[in-house]
Amino acid sequence: MNVIFDIGNVLIKWEPKNAFRHAFASDAQIDSFFAEIGFFDWNLAQDCGRSRDEGVAVIAEKWPHYRDLIDGYFDRFGDVVSERIEESWTILKELQSGGVRLFALTNWAKDTWPIGLAKHPDLQILIEDIV
């Protein structure tokens, strides 16, 4: 038997607000920032393969005052994916001990994947392959 786990919000909590807490006084301010720049659409384009530089340029073109802030998202990505979802890891380890082949699926961008992997090196040990 094979089992495929999604990584974001299944094995690892994805909390993009964590990358911006240093710059805003409240979650409501971060939510307003996200709405203003269309953060989730922007992030989807990043997940589809757009580079860090291209993504920063898209924001900087319309909101030059946010250039450094959005660029810092990549530097703070370790904070975005800092928390494991322990219940899922327990299931993963039980399946592994039972001889089940484990795979993972992710849409993390090429610029953020190495950061997430450095934060959670167990992904390489416990998962046979990642798509």
Stretches with model-predicted labels:
Residues K110-V131:
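Substrate-recognition "cap/lid" segment bordering the active-site pocket of phosphatases
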